Design a protein with these regions (language model features):
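Short glycine/threonine/proline-enriched tight-turn/helix- or strand-capping micro-motif at secondary-structure
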Residues: 1-20
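Short alpha-helix capping/helix-loop boundary micro-motifs
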Residues: 12, 57-60
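Short polar/acidic secondary-structure junctions
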Residues: 15-16, 30-32, 80
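Short acidic/polar mixed-charge low-complexity motifs
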Residues: 16, 45-47, 98
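Short, well-structured beta-strand-loop connectors
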Residues: 17-26, 59-77
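Zn2+-dependent peptidoglycan hydrolase active-site motif and core
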Residues: 20-58, 87-88
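Conserved, short, structured surface segments that act as functional micro-motifs
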Residues: 37-40, 64-107
């Protein structure tokens, strides 16, 4: 199966620590059938970030308030839909539940 996706894949070694891009509240943590272990952070003002293909060793809990740079978990290989790809973080950004190009926040 071939599928395109929103967001970006950021190459990193398996086991690399994944940190929050900004402060916020952990909205949910779940195992997505395509993207693997995923953490969604609500940053307020309509912004949310999503971190996928994480290992099962998640370091935060749902409803937890976090700061910018909080360790969320580690790069894993749980994204069944991208299992043939090199280890990476699948990162998505949303504004008012609409997908936003994540590269727009990196300068």
């Amino acid at each position: 199966m071939w599928k395109t996706h929103d967001g970006i894949d950021i190459k990193a070694d398996k086991g690399t620590v994944v940190k929050s891009i900004e402060k916020g509240n952990v909205e949910k943590i779940y195992n997505d059938s395509f993207y693997g272990y995923t953490i969604v952070i609500d940053h307020g003002q309509g912004y949310k970030s999503s971190y996928s293909n994480l290992s099962e060793d998640v370091l935060v809990k749902a409803k937890q308030t976090i700061n910018k740079g909080t360790k969320l978990g580690y790069i894993g290989d749980t994204a069944i839909g991208e299992i043939k790809d090199e280890p990476h973080l699948h990162f998505m950004l949303f504004l008012n539940n609409e997908n936003v190009d994540p590269t727009s926040i990196f300068k």
